[in-house]
From Swiss-Prot:
Entries under HAMAP family matching the protein: LpxH
Gene name of the encoded protein: lpxH
Example of a GO MF term: manganese ion binding
Cofactor(s), by name: Mn(2+)
Family: Belongs to the LpxH family.
GO cellular component, one term: extrinsic component of plasma membrane
Name recorded for this polypeptide: UDP-2,3-diacylglucosamine hydrolase
EC id: 3.6.1.54
UniProt source species: Azotobacter vinelandii (strain DJ / ATCC BAA-1303)
Length: 241
């Protein structure tokens, strides 16, 4: 049994190379897996299921094809695509996951997250996130005119890129104390997340026990996938082209 986990593809029409790599990944690897987990920022931006482009519909159709072959597909919101809704998931044949979600991999409980809520030292972002992800705010955003939603998406994307460049490295990375706290709260010794674009496997202690935090990589010059199978956890890059 093989489970694949990816995140931070930031799919966008301006990066057809990443889209081609993802479609190839679905055909060559995901279609052979028992499950595929996509842990947020699947799309560079998402302004609502009612505004899907032909590019996004093609991605949904490709996911559905994999799901119909027997691979269970799970999707978690990221900070760029938190407006993805159930309509897209129905078209894509995938299940929308809560953040965080506790699942069983290789017979052991594992916590899955996008990862932005672990960056608690970024106080300005956390405050902005709480306002934006409030159910009332989400409802209002989904009911704004499409032109206004497109304008806001461009504004937030540009602001996010600027802030990442300006902020200190430790602020936009996870807060070290937050990791064991949330792992202990959910009773797990393995945490898997994306968001930071810093792929690595970190060893730590949780309540005096050996634990690990696996950070998925973003897809840019290369792609990243975490494969979980009978031999363990394997985080590996692969070429985009």
């Amino acid at each position: 049994m093989t489970t694949l986990l990816i995140s931070d593809l930031h799919l966008d029409e301006e990066r057809p190379d990443i889209a081609r790599a993802f479609l190839r990944f679905l055909k060559e690897r995901a279609s052979q897996a028992e499950a595929l987990y996509i842990l947020g920022d699947f799309f560079e931006a998402w302004i609502g299921d009612d505004a899907m482009t032909s590019f996004q519909r093609d991605i949904a159709a490709a996911l559905r094809e994999v799901a119909e072959r027997g691979t269970r597909v799970f999707l978690m919101h990221g900070n760029r695509d938190f407006l993805v809704g159930h309509s897209f998931c129905r078209q894509a044949g995938c299940t929308l996951l809560r953040d965080p979600s506790r699942v069983i991999l290789n017979g052991a409980p594992v916590l899955l997250m996008h990862g932005d809520t672990l960056c608690t030292r970024d106080i300005a972002y956390m405050r902005f996130r709480r306002r934006l992800r409030n159910p009332v705010s989400v409802w209002l955003l989904r009911h704004l005119p499409l032109s206004k939603r497109r304008q806001l998406a461009r504004k937030w994307r540009d602001a996010s890129r600027m802030q990442v460049r300006r902020k200190a490295t430790e602020i936009v990375d996870v807060t070290p104390e937050e990791v064991p706290r949330i792992m202990a709260a959910h009773g797990v010794l393995t945490l898997i997340h994306g968001h930071t674009h810093r792929p690595a496997v970190h060893e730590l202690q949780v309540d005096g026990r050996q634990a690990r935090r696996i950070v998925l990589g973003d897809w840019n010059r290369q792609g990243w996938v975490l494969q979980v199978d009978g031999s363990g956890y394997h985080l590996t890059p692969f070429p985009i082209d």
